Amino acid sequence: FEHIVNDSGHIRLRRLETEEITGTRERPGLVEKYLSLSMEDETAVLQDICLKPGRMRIGDKRLCLHTLSDTEDLPGKLSTDMRYERMSTDRSDCRLSFAAPVGLLLSCNHIYSQYVFIDNAQEILQMMEKNSRNMLSLSRYSRSNAVNQEWTEMYLDEAHTKGVLPVRCHCNVIAWAEDAEEFRRIRNDTGSQLAMMECTPRYNTVDTPVLYWAGIPGNAGDFPAEESFYTFLEQAVCLFAGETNYRSSPSPFGIRMADRQNGIPVHVDISDLPMKRGIITNRNKFILGPSGSGKSFF
């Protein structure tokens, strides 16, 4: 699988080393950064963790959690990407991943977690066959049972006719702030971004500690099964966030540019590295900008 993804040329996978996960004496690892909610490369400050439902805290940081844990919360149609209106024109589209609103477009400290559980497909289909028969026998007592039985049959027909893989899926957004006013703002912003995806925002309070604990890197085995929903693999991967922040080029020379999203300076090689990766075939430059935009600095 790793070779297939890497050979595509679009994205690359790399297995993390043990020191990158657990850290060293000089640098914190991924687990330590997650438990302190800090991405600093310096040694993280030890902080108390309060796991009380409704008011979970890590040090001075108060956490809020929004989840996508039910098919009722999802839009009627999922896609791999969407048109970003701000950077699109009538002649060109700027395409971002479907979950971009809760990724880089969410302007606050947050973690977007995506879970896809690949269980035994045959057992899932057998369980749904049994549930379908039970709901059919109870359909005379409630119309909702008849509707659910019809939906289950549609799911089973899709699985058998197209041979798609049934999976369990869950997504959540953990955001945090240190003061009450900022906390209310990020809670509203997260809900608004989920609504932009045409999802129903579900603000969780009671199960925040459980889902935070399950989100520790390598600890997905503690994830509560009742927080996931059944779907197919194709629909589940539509909820992945495919964007990342700009990163400095590994080249020893380049130009300092500003990250368009956050204004952070980034070291960029605009000549050798793009040619090495096959993005460009020559080093010609064309600079376009109004008067006073800094063209002469190039």
Task: Give the ranges of each region predicted by the language model.
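Extended, folded cores of ATP/NTP-driven motor/assembly subunits in large transport
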Residues: 1-244
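Glycine-rich phosphate-binding loop of nucleotide-binding enzymes
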Residues: 252-298
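Pre-P-loop entry segment of helicase/translocase ATPase cores
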Residues: 231, 236-265
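Generic structural signal for short, flexible, solvent-exposed coil/loop and linker residues
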Residues: 162-164, 246, 257, 276
